[in-house]
C-alpha cells in the first residue's frame, strides 16, 4: 500500500484549512473599506487593492489554520468539524502550523508594502482571533463580543490601506 497524496487533495485541504469561502468574504469587507476610503482610482490603486486582497486572504487563512490546530481535538468530536484536515488526521498539526506561518509572513509583507499600519491591523487580527477569541469560545459566551473585534478589523484594514491613517471614519 502506498501513501500518495494528489494535487487535488492538497488543494482541497488548503481550501479547507484556510476556510476559503469565509476568507474571501472577509476580503470583500476589506475591499469595501478600501473603496470607501480611496479618493480616486489610478493604475497604482489597483496594485494596492491586489496586495490588500491577497494579504488579507493570507491573514484570514492563517487565522483559520491556527484555529484548526488549536481546536483539533474538539473538532474531531463534532460532526460539523470532524472532517477538517487537522481534526481528521489528513494534515499533521505541524504542517498546518507551517502553512499558517507562511501565510502570516506573506500577508504581513504584502500589507506592510501598502503601509505599516495595514500590517499592524493584520497582526492584531491574527493575535485576537487565535490567542483571545479561540480559547474563550469554550469558556464563555462573551467570546462572541471579543470575536467582534477581529471581525471588524478587515473593514478598518481596507480603510487604512486606502488612506494611510486610522480615524473615526473607519
Residue ranges and their predicted role:
Residues 28-36, 40-72, 80, 104, ...:
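Membrane-embedded alpha-helical segments that form the functional core of polytopic membrane enzymes
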Amino acid at each position: 500500500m502506498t501513501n500518495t497524496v494528489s494535487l487535488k487533495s492538497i488543494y482541497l485541504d488548503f481550501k479547507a484549512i484556510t476556510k476559503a469561502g469565509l476568507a474571501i468574504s472577509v476580503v470583500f469587507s476589506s475591499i469595501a473599506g478600501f473603496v470607501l476610503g480611496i479618493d480616486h482610482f489610478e493604475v497604482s490603486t489597483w496594485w494596492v487593492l491586489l496586495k490588500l486582497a491577497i494579504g488579507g486572504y493570507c491573514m484570514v487563512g492563517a487565522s483559520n489554520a491556527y484555529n484548526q490546530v488549536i481546536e483539533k481535538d474538539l473538532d474531531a468530536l463534532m460532526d460539523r468539524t470532524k472532517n477538517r484536515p487537522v481534526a481528521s488526521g489528513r494534515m499533521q498539526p505541524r504542517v498546518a502550523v507551517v502553512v499558517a506561518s507562511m501565510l502570516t509572513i506573506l500577508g504581513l509583507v504584502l500589507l506592510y508594502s501598502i503601509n505599516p499600519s495595514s500590517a499592524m491591523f493584520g497582526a492584531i487580527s491574527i493575535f485576537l482571533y487565535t490567542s483571545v477569541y479561540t480559547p474563550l469560545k469554550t469558556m464563555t459566551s462573551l467570546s462572541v463580543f471579543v470575536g467582534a473585534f477581529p471581525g471588524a478589523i478587515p473593514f478598518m484594514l481596507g480603510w487604512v490601506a486606502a488612506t494611510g491613517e486610522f480615524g473615526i471614519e473607519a
